[in-house]
Amino acid sequence: MKKIFSLALISLFAVILLAACGSKGSNGEASKESKKDTLAAIKDNDKIVFGVKTDTRLFGLKNPSSGEIEGFDIDIAKQIAKDILGDEKKAQFKEVTSKTRIPMLQNGDIDAIVATMTITEERKKEVDFSDVYFEAGQSLLVKKGSKIKSVENLGKGSKVLAVKGSTSSQNIREKAPEASVLEFENYAEAFTALKSGQGDALTTDNAILYGMADENKNYQLTGKPFTDEPYGIAVKKGQSALAKEINASLKKMKSDGRYDEIYKKWIKEDPAE
């Protein structure tokens, strides 16, 4: 009886040991998967998937006639694909918003974010950034004839429109603490709300607001920019090889004239030195 009990006990320990080893192996595989090299996967798949805006005039906007997404960010992404994979047509695009872009990157839905994304210390905790590829500043868009001339005019009773998940939404609460902030899912919704009278001003980066003012001549930017908003291209944390390739591409673009060409095409002026 004791012998049978001992054999049963040994068998039980063996099962537990095997299960533990199997679990360790699975965790190891999961760990390896989470650290998978994005650049290597891009080269294996022969494509690079960028998360881009589709509602931001001048930077990323879907052309209703062709169905293609067009803008500054799109052209920059295409040139990165050309430098990494040899062909700009190997760039693929998925729509993101300020709210969805980081989760989509972390889930592996996209390889990189090129979507008017400001480099901040808070975001650096979640993603890694490339070098700055565009210098913007937060400003206000108002209807022509508005009494609002600067952020200082946004007092009690003022309503400011912003986009969820954006640094602009956070900044305006600090710069105009007495104003009410209404948040929307994207810039198109926020601009529609401004035009329908739901707010007194719309706030985001001046580069984005220029596109809105260009679209509707009844609106204009007012006051000076009240923040610095350096845009960067985001990749998953730890993907230093991909970030290095992107930085090399940006540097090459600026040295061979491609960057200036794209800048003038969309922003209609020379890049600031």
From Swiss-Prot:
It is a lipid-anchor. Pfam families: SBP_bac_3 (PF00497). Keywords: Amino-acid transport, Cell membrane, Lipoprotein, Membrane, Palmitate, Signal, Transport. The keyword Endoplasmic reticulum does not apply. Induction: Positively regulated by TnrA under nitrogen-limited conditions. A lipid is attached at residue 21 (S-diacylglycerol cysteine). A lipid is attached at residue 21 (N-palmitoyl cysteine). It is found in: Cell membrane. Its main location: membrane. GO terms for cellular component: extracellular region; outer membrane-bounded periplasmic space; plasma membrane. Residues 1-20 form the signal peptide. One of its GO terms (molecular function) is ligand-gated monoatomic ion channel activity. One of its GO terms (biological process) is amino acid transport. The complex is composed of two ATP-binding proteins (GlnQ), two transmembrane proteins (GlnM and GlnP) and a solute-binding protein (GlnH). Belongs to the bacterial solute-binding protein 3 family. Part of the ABC transporter complex GlnHMPQ involved in glutamine transport. This is ABC transporter glutamine-binding protein GlnH.
